[in-house]
Amino acid sequence: MQFDLSSHKGKSNRLYFTNDKDKQFETSIREMYKLAKEKPLGADYRFYLRRYLINHLKKPTLFDNYINKVVIITDGYLESEGKPADTKIYGFESQLHQAVSIGNILDVITSKGLNIPKVDIDLSNSEILICEVNERKTGKGFDFEILKTYWEDWFKRMNAKKIVFIQREQANDLTAKRVTEFVTK
């Protein structure tokens, strides 16, 4: 789902996010959850960034400065259908869980060469919100911090201006509120 705010030049972006847009967002989220339950395939975010997002990012000009806001709704695990996982946890649980306890997750990921491969895209004018991250039962207490490290490292290497990473909320209206806050700031 995409919201193009370029027509709101000089206006508060808050004017764009009306009750109708909130309802559209909530309806779209419900539909995505329904589709995910019916056929739980992982999204290929690397492909999306490389192929599609790059064409939708606004670049600053001499006259206008743009900040792109990208909202990613995911469980946090980068596991697209038919491809090896980009967020490699399984097989490395003992080292990664220990790294969570010690606080050196990125060091372990990097030393083992597990970093998510960088996409050739400049996100220096982009703020990223990754939301609805949900640990699996086997990773409770550890996977959130590991996934957060994977995603933050990945987006930092693509020069993202700001990265916000939030866990799954128990109510859709809380997620909608967090998204609205992110987009309007």
Question: Which stretches of residues belong to each language-model region?
Answer:
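Von Willebrand factor
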Residues: 1-66, 69-73, 78
